Amino acid sequence: MKNVLAIILGGGAGSRLYPLTKQRAKPAVPLAGKYRLIDIPVSNCINADINKIYVLTQFNSASLNRHLSQTYNLSSGFGNGFVEVLAAQITPENPNWFQGTADAVRQYLWLIKEWDVDEYLILSGDHLYRMDYSQFIQRHRDTNADITLSVLPIDEKRASDFGLMKLDGSGRVVEFSEKPKGDELRAMQVDTTILGLDPVAAAAQPFIASMGIYVFKRDVLIDLLSHHPEQTDFGKEVIPAAATRYNTQAFLFNDYWEDIGTIASFYEANLALTQQPSPPFSFYDEQAPIYTRARYLPPTKLLDCQVTQSIIGEGCILKQCTVQNSVLGIRSRIEADCVIQDALLMGADFYETSELRHQNRANGKVPMGIGSGSTIRRAIVDKNAHIGQNVQIVNKDHVEEADREDLGFMIRSGIVVVVKGAVIPDNTVI
C-alpha cells in the first residue's frame, strides 16, 4: 500500500455537532474517553500500511494540528510517511474557502499531484468503523476500476440520508442518486442478495448506500477535478456524473459503521461502547488497534464507588459516586454523592491543584469537575467544565432543542450538552 495517498476530509464548520465544534475542528472532537474522531481513519490507514496521509480542514484546526503532530510521527526511522493538516487558505488564484468535499481536494491538487502514487484514498473524518483498506484497494485493482465506492446495505428509514446506487452483476455501479426522496427513493430499491445477503437480511435492507469512502485512480481524480471545476462535492456531483462514464465499482462493507456527525448519533455511538457482552464497536482489538496520543497519565482512582457498565479513561478521580452506563474521559473528577447515568463526560485537559481547588471554593468559585451531590443524566459534558454542588443536569422539562450557550449549555435532540469550560453554579437545575 506504499503507492496510495490517503486524503481525510475534515468537513465544514461542524454545525450539526455544535457546541462540541465551537473551539475545535470536527475531526478533533473527543471520542470514547481518550481518542479523537480523526484517530479512526488514521489508525485504519496505519493498520493497512498506508502512511502518506493528508487531513483537509477549514475551521478551528489548532487542536487538530496539535493532536496529529504529537501523535503520529510516521517519518521516524527515515521513512517518508506523514500525517499533515492542510487548512483552507485564501490565495490570489483562489479567493474562496472550500466549497465542498471535492473542492477541498481540488484546491490542494497542486500538492497532491506531486506524490508518485497509483491511487488516492478519500476518507471522511467523522465515521466510527474499523476497515481493512488494503482489501478495499485490492478490490479496486482486481476489477481494474477507475473509481471504487465502499458501500453497505441499508434500510428504508435511513436510506434517504445517503447516496444510493444500483449495480450490475459484476458489481459495477450503473446508477447513482444522492439522498433521494419519495418516488426517487423507491426507484433505487434493489435486491441486495447480489451483495451476498441472505433473503431475510436483503428484505430488511433493500438499498445500497455509499459510505462516502472512495478509491480513485490517480489520473482519473486529477482529470475529474481539473476539467469540472463546477463540481464541488463528491457525493452530490462528482460521483453521480462519473459513475456512468468510468468503470465505477462497489466494495461491500458489511460490518459496524456509524456516521457520527450529529449530537444524537455521536452520543448514541459513544454510549453503545458500554454495551455488554458485545458492543457494536470495540477498541479492544489487538489485530487492528486504534491509536491516539500517549499521555502518560496515572491510573484512575476510585474511592468507594459503584460503577456499572461504563468506560473510564485514565487519570480520573472518583469519590463515593454512582456511575451507570456512561463514558468518562481522561482526568474526569467526580466528587461524593454524585450520580452519573447515561452520560458522556469528556474529562479535562489538565489537573487543578488541590490548593487552587480549595482557593476557588473559598472564593465562591466552582472548581473543575463534577461537584458533590450532583446528578447528570442523558447529557454530554465537554472538557474542562466546572459543575457546582447539588447540580441537576437531567432535562427536567423534556426539552428537545434549546440554545442557552450564555448559561453554559445547549440541548440537542433532548440531550443536554454542557459547553467546553462552562461554569454551572451550585444548585442549578437544567
Swiss-Prot record:
Main enzyme class: transferase
Binding site for alpha-D-glucose 1-phosphate: G163, E178, K179, S210
Gene3D superfamilies: Hexapeptide repeat proteins (2.160.10.10), Spore Coat Polysaccharide Biosynthesis Protein SpsA, Chain A (3.90.550.10)
Catalysed transformations (reactions): alpha-D-glucose 1-phosphate + ATP + H(+) = ADP-alpha-D-glucose + diphosphate
BP GO terms, sorted: glycogen biosynthetic process
Keywords recorded for this protein, A-Z: ATP-binding, Carbohydrate metabolism, Glycogen biosynthesis, Glycogen metabolism, Nucleotide-binding, Nucleotidyltransferase, Transferase
Domain of life: Bacteria
One Gene Ontology molecular-function label: ATP binding
EC annotation from Swiss-Prot or TrEMBL: 2.7.7.27
InterPro entries: ADP-Glc_PPase, ADP_Glu_pyroP_CS, GlgC_bac, NTP_transferase_dom, Nucleotide-diphossugar_trans, Trimer_LpxA-like_sf
SUPFAM superfamilies, alphabetized: Nucleotide-diphospho-sugar transferases, Trimeric LpxA-like enzymes
PROSITE patterns: ADP_GLC_PYROPHOSPH_1 (PS00808), ADP_GLC_PYROPHOSPH_2 (PS00809), ADP_GLC_PYROPHOSPH_3 (PS00810)
Claim: tRNA-binding is one of the keywords in the record: no
Pathway it works in: Glycan biosynthesis; glycogen biosynthesis
GO CC field: carboxysome
Pfam families tied to this protein: LbH_GLGC (PF25247), NTP_transferase (PF00483)
Task of the protein: Involved in the biosynthesis of ADP-glucose, a building block required for the elongation reactions to produce glycogen. Catalyzes the reaction between ATP and alpha-D-glucose 1-phosphate (G1P) to produce pyrophosphate and ADP-Glc.
Sequence similarity: Belongs to the bacterial/plant glucose-1-phosphate adenylyltransferase family.
Subunit structure: Homotetramer.
The name this protein goes by in its record: Glucose-1-phosphate adenylyltransferase
